[in-house]
């Protein structure tokens, strides 16, 4: 586990929770690929704790969720090795019988090691005589057990012991499967009791649930009951609810629930990503070996003996550090997944150092020559990361259909222009998707309130944001115009009404200025105070972009867009 300055504080928090044997639920939230699951798993395994895990995105009922928790229950040895908990830990009489049989087998082996070779020779002679006498090689029921050799007896004893263990495991698995049938809906207390029966321990069991926001779709009030898990059971249980959305956005505001402990994982900064990726360096010796083999093959084919440079390990480390910094600068706006960045760096490094092997540039030369060698591959890797698999498959099918109808040289010009326009639209959609994914949570709230303030006039504020019953009628012909100018104070009031649980400190002047610097908002410069400033949403803040932002924080913006089609009936 790689620790940074911010992660060390979070690890200390989780470590204190584990050491103090905390009982209850803990909500762990943060953006995607911030190390929530790996950090908790690392702390539990380092402290040798019993835990089980499940991904709520893969289950649609409590029965299937409880089955996956039961199958993933893990115990940690004193040596730090992870092992599954066996069903046969409680059956002492079977283990004692097996141990006794093993001791007898070991004694027989130690006493009769010198006679085994003689017995094997005698058996071979007897088998030859039996074959000559017409004896059948197949299994005979009348064949006496005493006439067998010691090795055959030992093998039969081991087979019998294994059959006992196998039968016992089948019986135990049937018992546990009867406790949680697929058709029933077990309660939380029943599930915890089954986990402790399987683990046969009095220590705390940790339960990790990823994508816990999906539990809101389960039957009944199951998600709210998890907050009171320590009240339902007498066994010590610590529940980790992992999500990318804060608790205030998941839970409904009308219900009362117990305040839950929160642990926030902030997003990785570019320097933190570099420090993590640099710990996963490729094998430089294999890369050098492959480069030398390719150079030798080319020299044999062309009859040229060029003097290729041999890089030292220090030079490889310096060049890899430069490549990682370059890749992180290019990729951190689209993705911050560390696994993707490591994969890209390992694939690009042999091509990155190819000009140095060829002798076209040195180790300490400018990076422009090295970057030109991998520029096309960086663009391809960016497309592979940002584009979804469905879009790639649709493009392949469309290209195959066009090439079957028209040869590559006879494609009409109109079709080429349409393809270029479609590619531009896809690029805009992908850019907006990446922007919506990387914007922080508090800026998303401000952008939603600014979009509503810029799209609709002040006359509709009472219709959209009031909680009182208002008479309204539909508009048959409504003229849709572009974004309008709005005051800072109006956007702040809309944000207070849409997100009452959030702190008022979020809607400050600094956030609006930062959005204006990022070209999400336009401003009118003035010497007056901030609350008299006027703002307007730019073209980057369009409807699809706002829908993606609202979906990421579980905010239903369609209800406000549908309500805007009406008008208040004047009394």
Curated annotation (Swiss-Prot):
Gene Ontology CC annotation, any one: nucleus
Residues in the signal sequence: none
Composition bias type Basic and acidic residues, residue spans: 417-428
Residue ranges with Low complexity bias: 107-133, 407-416
Subunit structure: ORC is composed of six subunits.
Organism: Dictyostelium discoideum (Social amoeba)
Domain of life of the native organism: Eukaryota
Name of the protein this chain belongs to: Origin recognition complex subunit 5
Stated family: Belongs to the ORC1 family.
Keyword Endoplasmic reticulum in record: no
One GO biological process term: DNA replication initiation
InterPro entries: ORC5 (IPR020796), ORC5_C (IPR047088), ORC5_lid (IPR048866), P-loop_NTPase (IPR027417)
Region (Disordered): 90-142, 404-430
Protein's cellular compartments: Nucleus
GO MF term list: DNA replication origin binding
Described function: Component of the origin recognition complex (ORC) that binds origins of replication. DNA-binding is ATP-dependent, however specific DNA sequences that define origins of replication have not been identified so far. ORC is required to assemble the pre-replication complex necessary to initiate DNA replication.
Record's keyword terms, sorted: DNA replication, DNA-binding, Nucleus
């Amino acid at each position: 586990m790689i620790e940074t300055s911010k992660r060390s504080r979070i690890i200390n928090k989780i470590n204190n929770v584990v050491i103090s044997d905390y009982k209850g639920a803990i909500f762990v939230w943060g953006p995607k690929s911030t190390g929530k699951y790996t950090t908790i798993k690392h702390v539990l395994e380092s402290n040798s704790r019993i835990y089980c895990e499940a991904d709520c995105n893969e289950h649609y009922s409590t029965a299937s969720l409880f089955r996956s928790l039961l199958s993933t229950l893990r115990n940690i040895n004193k040596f730090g090795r992870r092992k599954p908990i066996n069903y046969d830990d409680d059956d002492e009489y079977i283990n004692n019988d097996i141990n006794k049989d093993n001791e007898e087998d070991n004694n027989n082996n130690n006493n009769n090691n010198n006679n085994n070779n003689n017995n094997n020779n005698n058996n071979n002679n007897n088998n030859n005589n039996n074959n000559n006498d017409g004896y059948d090689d197949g299994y005979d029921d009348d064949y006496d057990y005493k006439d067998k050799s010691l090795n055959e007896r030992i093998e039969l004893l081991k087979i019998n012991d294994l059959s006992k263990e196998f039968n016992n495991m089948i019986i135990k698995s049937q018992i546990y499967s009867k406790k949680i049938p697929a058709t029933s809906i077990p309660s939380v207390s029943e599930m915890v009791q089954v986990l402790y029966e399987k683990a046969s321990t009095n220590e705390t069991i940790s339960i990790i649930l990823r994508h816990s926001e999906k539990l809101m779709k389960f039957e009944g009030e199951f998600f709210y009951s998890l907050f009171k898990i320590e009240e339902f059971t007498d066994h010590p249980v610590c529940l980790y609810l992992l999500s990318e959305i804060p608790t205030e956005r998941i839970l409904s505001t009308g219900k009362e629930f117990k305040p839950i402990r929160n642990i926030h994982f902030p997003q990785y900064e570019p320097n933190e990503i570099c420090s993590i990726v640099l710990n996963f360096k490729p094998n430089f010796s294999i890369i050098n070996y492959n480069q030398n083999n390719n150079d030798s093959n080319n020299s044999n084919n062309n009859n040229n003996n060029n003097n290729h440079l041999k890089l030292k390990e220090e030079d490889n480390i310096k060049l890899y550090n430069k490549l990682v910094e370059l890749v992180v600068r290019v990729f951190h706006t689209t993705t911050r997944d560390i696994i993707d960045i490591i994969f890209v760096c390992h694939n690009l490094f042999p091509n990155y150092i190819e000009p140095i092997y060829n002798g076209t540039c040195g180790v300490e030369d400018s990076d422009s020559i090295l970057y030109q060698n991998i520029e096309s591959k960086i663009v391809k890797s960016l497309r592979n990361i940002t584009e979804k698999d469905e879009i790639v498959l649709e493009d392949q099918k469309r290209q195959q259909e066009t090439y079957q109808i028209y040869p590559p040289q006879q494609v009409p010009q109109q079709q080429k222009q349409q393809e270029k326009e479609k590619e531009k639209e896809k690029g805009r959609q992908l850019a907006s998707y990446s922007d919506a994914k990387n914007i922080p949570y508090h800026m998303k709230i401000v952008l939603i309130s600014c979009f509503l303030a810029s799209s609709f006039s002040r006359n509709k504020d009472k219709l959209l944001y009031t909680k009182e019953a208002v008479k309204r009628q539909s508009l048959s012909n409504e003229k849709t115009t572009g974004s309008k100018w709005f005051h800072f104070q109006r956007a702040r009031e809309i944000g207070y009404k849409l997100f009452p649980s959030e702190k008022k400190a979020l809607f400050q002047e600094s956030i609006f200025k930062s959005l204006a610097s990022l070209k999400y908002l336009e401003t009118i410069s003035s010497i007056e105070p901030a609350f008299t400033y006027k703002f307007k949403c730019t073209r980057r803040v369009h409807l699809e972009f706002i829908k993606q932002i609202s979906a990421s924080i579980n905010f239903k913006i369609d209800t406000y867009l549908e309500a805007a089609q009406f008008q208040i009936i004047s009394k």
